[in-house]
Design a protein with these regions (language model features):
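Carboxylate-rich, polar loop motifs that coordinate divalent cations or form catalytic acidic clusters
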Residues: 1-241
Length: 241
């Protein structure tokens, strides 16, 4: 299949994680009974060493070949949902739903980061060599040393997702997408024909834009209006490259 859409209906998280060897086609499922911190999974990240980091409602799990390690309260993580995990420049960052950002130090312990304002985090993504973070108070980039603000035209809004394809970066708000044109950011309001639709994720492929929302999966081409593909509550939208 060229495209894989991962979506769940009327739920808030993934139930388990399944991994495979693409050449052999062998799938293996990991859940709580096999060592994952929780069956409620929010994000999965593969680092530069091909290790898999799984963020859950009850900490983070590291899958390193046949070895599994759980990170939780005893490793410095707070008792709350870990909504995103990102590996950048060999540092693991963990975003929580309401306790800010944490990073894994050289002693294999998570420490709370002091480089952002606001404990409520909406999303955290790698954008080039920098870490993009959207909180209740700000949208910023972190380069490992210092914070920079997004700059001219970037709205003060909640960012739910970031889509990156080559030199194109799309920041996704509840009802808008934001792109950089020239030296400034431009927002586009997305108009759905249903009420109370909130965008959760975005993907663009071969001239078609896909919007994963709380009211279904929508698509559009350049000269056409939005079309509803599925009524599912889409939590993740991805592509099998």
């Amino acid at each position: 299949m060229n495209k894989i859409y991962r979506s769940l209906i009327l739920t808030v998280s993934i139930i388990s994680i399944t991994v495979a060897n693409p050449k052999k086609g062998n799938w293996k499922q990991f859940d709580y009974t096999s060592g994952i911190s929780s069956n409620y999974i929010f994000d999965v990240e593969k680092d530069s060493q091909s290790r898999v980091w799984v963020s859950t409602q009850n900490g983070i799990t590291l899958i390193d070949g046949n070895k599994i390690k759980k990170y939780g309260l005893s490793h410095g993580l707070p008792p709350t949902n870990i909504i995103k995990v990102v590996s950048i420049d060999n540092v693991i960052y963990a975003a929580t739903s309401n306790k800010g950002i944490y990073y894994l130090d050289d002693n294999d312990m998570f420490q709370k980061a002091d480089f952002i304002q606001g404990d409520k985090v909406y999303t955290m993504n790698a954008v080039g060599s920098k870490l993009f973070i959207s909180t209740k108070l700000e949208n910023v980039l972190y380069d490992g040393q210092k914070i920079s603000f997004m700059g001219n035209g970037f709205p003060n809004t909640k960012i739910r997702d970031v889509f990156i394809d080559r030199d194109k970066t799309v920041f996704v708000g509840d009802q808008e997408i934001i792109v950089k044109k020239g030296n400034k950011y431009v927002s586009e309001k997305i108009k759905f024909d249903k009420k109370k639709v909130k965008i959760k994720n975005f993907f663009s492929f071969k001239g078609v834009d896909y919007f994963g929302t709380n009211k279904g999966l929508w698509s559009r081409t350049k000269n056409e209006s939005l079309a509803l593909i599925s009524k599912a509550d889409v939590l993740s939208l991805d592509h099998d490259k």
